[in-house]
Each structure stands twice: as C-alpha cells, then as structure tokens.
C-alpha cells in the first residue's frame, strides 16, 4: 500500500501528494489517516499529485495528514444480504441493525454490458395507474423517467409505482435516494415495512444534507447492487429519486476540479456522466433491470440541459404538469406530453393503440377549442365540437385516480386498475356510451363501473 499526504483542501475536493512511482489510478479509493474518510481519485495533476473528491465531510481534515491508497475502486456489498437494509454510498449500514454480513463486494465503477450481451424486451409492465398504462406504457426491462417541477408529485407517483409494481411483480427492487429529503427516505422505509415487501428491497441513501461526493456516487452504488441481481438471472426494479440531484452534485464539484462550466453553469462532462450511468442500466440475456427515475425539472423548463440530456436515454417519459395539478387532477400526468416507445400497435395491439390515440386526439382538440370558448363561450361551438368538449372533460377527470400511498391525504382508498378495464373505460367514453353521465362522476374513481355507480348515487 502506497501512502501520500494531503497538500490542499477546497471544500469537498482534496489534493494528495504521492511518491511519483506510486501515483494512484483514477477512481482508486484512498483512506485518510484514522480511517473515517474515503477519497476517490478524479484527476492526476502531475508531479505525484492527485485530485480527489471526499465521500463524506471534510471537517477536521488538515494538510499533512497521511493518506493510504487501497489500490482498488470503492466497493460495496452485493447479494441477498443487502435486502431489507439501508446503506450509504460506501455500503455501510445506516439502519442500526448491525453489519450487512455480505458474502461479496463489487466495485461501483464497471463497464456497461457489450452490444452482443444486451437484450430488449417487448413485454408490458402493468402499473395499475390508468393514464400511464394507456398513453405511456412501460416495458419490462425499459427505462422510465418521471419529469416534473417542484411539488407536482414525482415522489408520490414513484411511491405508488413502487407500491403497485413491487407488490404485483414480487421481484427484487433497489431504491437509490440521490440527494432527496431524508423524510422521504424515512417514509419509504416504513411504507415498505407496512406493505410487507421490505425483505425484497435494498435501499441506498445519499440525502440532501450529504456532501456532493456522496450524492455523485450513490446512484452508482445502487446500480451496482441491481447489476448483481440481474447477473444472477433475476428481473430487478431500480428506482432512482432523483437523477437531477446526481447531475447537480457533479456541477458542485466540477468547478472545484478546475473545469470550465458549460451551458447554464453545468459541468462540461454532463452528457458523458449521464451516459456512463444510463448505459449501465440495461437488460441482458441473463436478467433484466427495469428502472424508474424521477427527474426534477428546474423552473418547469424541459429544455434545461439536465432534463434534456436525460430524455435521450429513456424508453418512456411521464411528464407531470403544473396546470393539471392546479385543476386538482392527480396524478398530474400530461397525456399529450408523455410518450413511450411501446405505444405501437405491433407491441400493445391495435385496440389499445386506437384508444390511446383517440384520447390524445380529443384532448388536443379540446385544448385548441379552449381559446374560442374563453372569447365566445360554449354556445358558439358546433354540435360536434360541444360533444368533443364534453367527452374531453370526462376523459380529463377519468385520468385522475386515488392512490394507495395518498390515502392519508385524500381519505379515499387507493385503486389498482387493470389494463383491460382502463381500455374498456376510455373506449366507452370515446364511443359516447357514457355521454349521459355527469362529468363529476368520473373524478377520482378507479374503473368505469365505479364511475357509473358514483353517477347513480349523485342523482
């Protein structure tokens, strides 16, 4: 083991000098004297000096402290022992339940599977959320992004997806909390415990209050655990909340590493950093990783470099809209903005495709008519347009749904709606079968039968 000493500390970035013949490799993990702090090598500056990022607080460190090179990247526990446990970026348990007791550790930096080993899946993953199953269906082994500004419901939607899929899917899940609120991590843990699925979930947290090094690497820690399950031939779910914070952590240390900022102050290596992470989240011929990633959209601007870079890696994008949330329609998913590569008649079948496109056509026409209605009122519309407006308003309300994880807020029990019922309900509205029902009957219900029952009660 070679050793060096700290020569400079600027925030989370630390320069360490080693003898010239024993300079550590990039991504090697270094241990500071006392063993409490781990550093990861980012750059070799020449003259035996390496620039590192601290995985933890740099308080109490000073120049001259001895640093040992471990001659290996950061490695974390993998395998079934991680299930039901909460770990930090280095794989240390933070749930006060004692050591993990792992049989194997793996480095967090690995290469993505080769082209020959990758496989794409065409099987649909039913989520039980009407709007998602209808207009932006998920693929098993696909990548999904939940895009939204502050407070439109990304985390609640993710919790509901975990609740529905983890229970129905009965496979293994890995949850990576990247720079999010500790309270949400806490809520998630107890939610899983209550749902009796805690023994199928491994949790890795690098929360908001942690240094940028932790937030930058915690996504890779979670991904490494998911890759191990995949390579054992399992189908894994990987949840990441929030990908934007991963980018932000990179931005925080980028300037300290001496890089010139690029557009909007982001790091110049933004696309590469995102690519390194996303290319590893993939399915192989052995097993699959289905990932759901929450993506914060700064100032509701989808053209911001961070969400824009994420878009290109995803199979399905679920866009949450503030306008829809303002109407009180939850989940506030925009059916016109959300897309999926699976929305193809060859994959989902002709009926599903026709209904989904029909719903989008009616909603788009209603959007166009809104200006006319605002100026001239409903009476000036043709009979055909009046009918479109009426059906669009019913569809809008029918896209809402009570969530299991939001029962405490709404007071109504959550509903899981099968894909068959979803298609039947929307097809009925489009065909005019329910033109006689009041639009309020469609608000916050599960299947169409429930809407019919609700209409009878309100009469």
UniProtKB/Swiss-Prot annotation:
<protein>
    <recommendedName>
        <fullName>ATP synthase subunit beta</fullName>
        <ecNumber>7.1.2.2</ecNumber>
    </recommendedName>
</protein>
<keyword id="KW-0813">Transport</keyword>
<keyword id="KW-0472">Membrane</keyword>
<dbReference type="GO" id="GO:0016887">
    <property type="term" value="F:ATP hydrolysis activity"/>
</dbReference>
<keyword id="KW-1003">Cell membrane</keyword>
<feature type="binding site">
    <location>
        <begin position="148"/>
        <end position="155"/>
    </location>
    <ligand>
        <name>ATP</name>
    </ligand>
</feature>
<dbReference type="Pfam" id="PF22919">
    <property type="entry name" value="ATP-synt_VA_C"/>
</dbReference>
<dbReference type="InterPro" id="IPR050053">
    <property type="entry name" value="ATPase_alpha/beta_chains"/>
</dbReference>
<dbReference type="Pfam" id="PF02874">
    <property type="entry name" value="ATP-synt_ab_N"/>
</dbReference>
<dbReference type="InterPro" id="IPR020003">
    <property type="entry name" value="ATPase_a/bsu_AS"/>
</dbReference>
<dbReference type="InterPro" id="IPR055190">
    <property type="entry name" value="ATP-synt_VA_C"/>
</dbReference>
<dbReference type="InterPro" id="IPR024034">
    <property type="entry name" value="ATPase_F1/V1_b/a_C"/>
</dbReference>
<keyword id="KW-0139">CF(1)</keyword>
<dbReference type="InterPro" id="IPR003593">
    <property type="entry name" value="AAA+_ATPase"/>
</dbReference>
<comment type="subunit">
    <text>F-type ATPases have 2 components, CF(1) - the catalytic core - and CF(0) - the membrane proton channel. CF(1) has five subunits: alpha(3), beta(3), gamma(1), delta(1), epsilon(1). CF(0) has three main subunits: a(1), b(2) and c(9-12). The alpha and beta chains form an alternating ring which encloses part of the gamma chain. CF(1) is attached to CF(0) by a central stalk formed by the gamma and epsilon chains, while a peripheral stalk is formed by the delta and b chains.</text>
</comment>
<dbReference type="InterPro" id="IPR027417">
    <property type="entry name" value="P-loop_NTPase"/>
</dbReference>
<keyword id="KW-0067">ATP-binding</keyword>
<keyword id="KW-0997">Cell inner membrane</keyword>
<keyword id="KW-0547">Nucleotide-binding</keyword>
<dbReference type="InterPro" id="IPR000194">
    <property type="entry name" value="ATPase_F1/V1/A1_a/bsu_nucl-bd"/>
</dbReference>
<dbReference type="InterPro" id="IPR036121">
    <property type="entry name" value="ATPase_F1/V1/A1_a/bsu_N_sf"/>
</dbReference>
<dbReference type="GO" id="GO:0005524">
    <property type="term" value="F:ATP binding"/>
</dbReference>
<keyword id="KW-0406">Ion transport</keyword>
<dbReference type="GO" id="GO:0005886">
    <property type="term" value="C:plasma membrane"/>
</dbReference>
<keyword id="KW-1278">Translocase</keyword>
<comment type="similarity">
    <text>Belongs to the ATPase alpha/beta chains family.</text>
</comment>
<dbReference type="GO" id="GO:0046933">
    <property type="term" value="F:proton-transporting ATP synthase activity, rotational mechanism"/>
</dbReference>
<dbReference type="InterPro" id="IPR005722">
    <property type="entry name" value="ATP_synth_F1_bsu"/>
</dbReference>
<dbReference type="InterPro" id="IPR004100">
    <property type="entry name" value="ATPase_F1/V1/A1_a/bsu_N"/>
</dbReference>
<keyword id="KW-0066">ATP synthesis</keyword>
<dbReference type="GO" id="GO:0045259">
    <property type="term" value="C:proton-transporting ATP synthase complex"/>
</dbReference>
<keyword id="KW-0375">Hydrogen ion transport</keyword>
<dbReference type="Pfam" id="PF00006">
    <property type="entry name" value="ATP-synt_ab"/>
</dbReference>
<comment type="function">
    <text>Produces ATP from ADP in the presence of a proton gradient across the membrane. The catalytic sites are hosted primarily by the beta subunits.</text>
</comment>
